[in-house]
Amino acid sequence: MVEVEKKKITLSIPVETNGKLEELAQKYGMTKSGLVNFLVNQVAEAGTIYRQ
């Protein structure tokens, strides 16, 4: 297993957005931080936050 250095952060997001994040994380069997990490990596690979 590869050891990944981690940094704790605090985000202030709307309650509704947090609910969506929790629902998506549960739906795909991920933690909220894992889902955020996945989405950030997807955007980095695509080079944009917009659909192409």
UniProtKB/Swiss-Prot annotation:
Gene Ontology MF: a single term: DNA binding
GO BP terms in the entry: plasmid maintenance; regulation of DNA-templated transcription
Gene3D superfamilies, alphabetized: Met repressor-like
InterPro entries (alphabetical): Arc_rbn_hlx_hlx (IPR013321), Ribbon_hlx_hlx (IPR010985)
DNA-binding span(s): 20-40
Record SUPFAM superfamilies: Ribbon-helix-helix
Superkingdom assignment: Bacteria
Keywords: DNA-binding, Plasmid, Plasmid copy control, Repressor, Transcription, Transcription regulation
Transmembrane segments: none
Subunit structure: Homodimer.
Protein function: Regulates the plasmid copy number. RepA binds to the repAB promoter thus controlling the synthesis of the plasmid replication initiator protein RepB.
Entry's family note: Belongs to the transcriptional regulatory CopG/NikR family.
Protein name: Protein RepA
Species of origin: Lactiplantibacillus plantarum
